[in-house]
Amino acid sequence: MENLANRLDACQDKILELYERDSDKLEDQITHWYLMRVESALYYKARECGMTRIGHQVVPTLSVAKAKACSAIEMHVALQQLQQSAYGKEPWTLRDTSREMWDAVPKRCWKKRGVTVEVRYDGDETKAMCHVLWKDIIVQNLSDDQWVKVKGQVSYEGLYYVHEDVKVFYVKFHKDARVYGETGIWEVHVGGKVIHHNAFDPVSSTQEVPATGPLYASHNTTRSPTQAPLGPEEGQERKRRRLEAVGPGPQQQQQQQHQQQQQQQTPTHTPSTQACARTGGPVDSNRTRDCDSTSQNPYRHPSDPDCAPVIHLRGDPNSLKCFRYRLQNGKKGLYCKASSTWRWSCEPENQSAFVTIWYTSVTQRAEFLANVKIPPGMQAILGHMSVF
């Protein structure tokens, strides 16, 4: 017990030295989180041995010590990866590498140079909310785990950044409009400038992906006064592009269902399409198979509004968990939700496991496959599932 107390005192003394030094070197911040790991491990071991106090310090429970240790390990590993990037030589303070900063939106990435953005709902100062716009956001690529720096931006819709040609919103102003406002209109005040509702243009050359949830199909939009009136052909073309972006409407779905029923009455199955309707194929760098796009199986209707496009990832359980974790941190806007790891009950535990990923539309699923690299040794089986 005395040896454990001495080690804990030495560890905490080094932590206090780092606090007093207030260094801006990344090496010192890595050392800080390493010492936090050691401290939590010592607490865990002491509690495991039945100790409730070490000197005058209360030993936390096993669950608390374990949670703090896991948090410190995550921060320590993330900082080690950051040190190997091109931004390892930049100034990094304890505040920049704190857990609170890591968990602040956008979560699980490094942020610097924050600017306050005030959103006034209904144009009333008493109905204002403040958010932080990070000018520098360092996010991790999903394909090669490299850290890259992107610029934080603001629009009438919210706060976002563009990573790998995908616009990722981490704050959406319309959510607070339902709580604080009545008209659904707001003003964005940032850096002495004001962004009004009539300055919002829903048509953009950059592809937009919401931070979470399905694609937002309805927005109260107004054409900017600076835009010239569209002719009939241009207006129809822009309307068609918007409809394609949000997926088929109810009338289109009914037409697709009617066509599907007609095709079922006159089936023309070939051996290859029948086999494809029963099984899914792996998705790799050389080929992509979507069985539902060619199958006439009456139990699968891609146009059925009660069915959602999915991808069943099959592989090693640990690899699936790691891949799902990376998706949640870096590509959450490219899918709707992901399941936990599961298996068929008739298979032994040493067999491959599955993770099912849901999408709001086939377009979103295709965008996911175009932007996300499936790890080697992992199969992606495309299909549809009933919505529940």
From Swiss-Prot:
Renumbered residue ranges of the record's region Transactivation domain: 1-206
Polar residues: compositionally biased ranges: 218-227, 266-276
Main location: host cell
Region (DNA-binding domain): 307-388
Record localization: Host nucleus
GO CC annotation terms, alphabetical: host cell nucleus
Alphabetized SUPFAM superfamilies for the sequence: E2 regulatory, transactivation domain, Viral DNA-binding domain
Record family assignment: Belongs to the papillomaviridae E2 protein family.
Full protein name: Regulatory protein E2
Gene designation per UniProt: E2
